[in-house]
Amino acid sequence: MTRREIRNCAFILIYEKLLRDDPIEELYETADEIEEITVNDSVKILVESVLEKAEELDGKISNYSTTRSITRIPKINLAILRIAFYEILYDDLTPVNVAINEAVLLLSLIHI
């Protein structure tokens, strides 16, 4: 799986978690059942890392969001922002410009 595919699968799961506060293991099982999302160790690591740091990431996002509070940011956008901020702050393997570019690309794909 490419890093982009991992990120896309993680995005869907993080977004689902924002919509439904189900246990993450249940979301993994559902994803496996419908076979639309690949849930491998790489996806799980990214999802769980982002969810573990969600409160801290939201604080950082809030610092840069001068016009909207974190609760007013659409959940679909928040999921993408959390992944991007996580990669920028904690993922040494992803250069900052790549994390930003991937977030913009993902936003453009979902906001067609």
Placement of each model-derived feature along the sequence:
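Long, amphipathic alpha-helical "stalk/connector" segments that mediate intersubunit docking
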Residues: 1-30
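Short, surface-exposed helix-loop/turn micro-motifs enriched in polar/charged residues
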Residues: 2-3, 72-73, 92-96
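Conserved AdoMet
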Residues: 7, 35-90
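Amphipathic alpha-helical scaffolding segments comprising HEAT/armadillo-like alpha-solenoid repeats
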Residues: 23-28, 58-63, 102
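Alpha-solenoid HEAT/Armadillo-like helical repeat scaffolds in large eukaryotic proteins
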Residues: 30-31, 106
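Glycine-rich active-site/cofactor-binding loop and its immediate structural neighborhood
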Residues: 84-92, 97-101, 106
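Conserved small/polar residues in nucleotide/adenosyl-binding loops
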Residues: 111-112
